[in-house]
Amino acid sequence: MTTATIDAAGYSTAERTAIIVSCMLGFALDLYDVLIMPFLMGSIQKSLGISLAQVSSVTSLTLIGSVIGGALFGYLGDHVGRKQALQLALLMFAAGSIASAFAWSYWSLAILRFVTGIGLGGEWGAGMVLFNEAWNKERRGIGSAFIQGSAVLAAASASIVGVWATTSYSLEWGWRIALLTGGSPILLMIFIRSFMPESKAWQQFDALRKRGAIETAAAKTNTLVAMFRGPLLPISIMCLFWMMAYMFCYYGIVVFMPTLMQRTLDAPPEIVRNISVIASVVGGLSYLTMGALNDRFGRRFGALLPGLSWAVMAVALFLYSHEKYQGSILHFPIFWIYLSFVIGNSALGVVGTWLSEIYPIDVRSTAVSFIYMAGRGVGSLAPVVVPLVAGLFGGSLAAGMTVVAPAILIFLLMTVLLPETRGRELAVSAKTRPQHVAA
């Protein structure tokens, strides 16, 4: 039995451009669909005559669906191809979002948003794996940072469209029109079908697999099981804890920071808006900076430095979160705490690249998709946990938000323990069966 290394063929500049543009748009649409819902919740509640708890549960169901979608489309990405899985995920995503606009009751909306979540969950992993398999290994970090940095575009678009739709149209139609904009992934599907190539590394691997000329760990079982077997078991457990800790901290702070500033610390709405705009700019620059640094110093560095910024944020939140706005942003402690938080967020820029480099090609799509979406699923619990903890401390929202501190420590610990992979080839390295030649 011999070991064969199958190198991915080169990609043209046009092909690489199509890949990164589609991934940036895909991630932006993914996050846009999640972030626009808070702007629509009030209108949906009144239009359908449902409770706030019910409309809030719709977002939770969407995130639960995304965990299932991550596993499903990750599996398909390893079996039918990265591009095909991405197209199928976008189709379900778009169909669910468009259909949601015509929901007539709580249950119809809940089911359709759950379906939307399944499609949404498959988009990120399939696109991110294809990107990393096609991109220059020396610049994967900065490329991944550009993709994740499109979150800034998503947040801005969600706020603009959400406010525009609910204020420009009737109560019955405003939220429906906003949800219809989620059908834009159909346009991205057409773009992908026309311009974006399939992963050449996967095509070569699949050709050998179909000929029976290659042996992989996933050949004897499904890819979701294979990622938890043998030497991948401890790695997968660490990756899950790593991603879950990140998402719990992210949602535990980002959901409540505007409320903390405005209602608890007496910051006027325009000051909260200005701080959010400044934070978005700093966050975008941080993504790009960390992307360049993790290409130079390693994936661990690209996650560790932002994680330490989060640690500073947690300590400062504990010490200074009681200091109210006194007329100056620069003398408002929560402003600097928020900047420390958004700098820490840039750890997400290394996630897709690090996970893609950690896992072998036969389980890569499944592992990357499932781990990311499982993390997001756990992160969705933070908006429930924070108020509960706040209640234990006399209703102090800031005290409730400090519940993210253990998650930060777990994130830092897993960052130190995970293997460094900078510069790793994502071509296939697998055992091939010997070929018998007739005499």
Model-flagged regions — what are they?
Residues M1-Y32:
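Cytosolic juxtamembrane N-terminal segment immediately preceding the first transmembrane helix
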Residues M37-P38, P231-G284, P383:
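Extracytoplasmic gate region of multi-pass secondary transporters
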Residues G49, G81, F102-S108, N136, ...:
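Helix-breaking motifs and short loop linkers at transmembrane-helix boundaries and internal kinks
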Residues I68-W104:
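Conserved MFS/SLC helix-loop-helix module at the cytosolic interface between two early adjacent transmembrane helices
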Residues H79-L90, R296-L308:
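Cytoplasmic membrane-interface "Motif A"-like loop-to-helix N-cap segments
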Residues L91-W104, S309-Q326:
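C-terminal ends and interior cores of transmembrane alpha-helices
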Residues L112-G149:
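Cytoplasmic helix-loop-helix junction between adjacent transmembrane helices
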Residues G141-T166, P185, Y372-P383:
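Glycine-rich segments within core transmembrane alpha-helices of 12-TM secondary carriers
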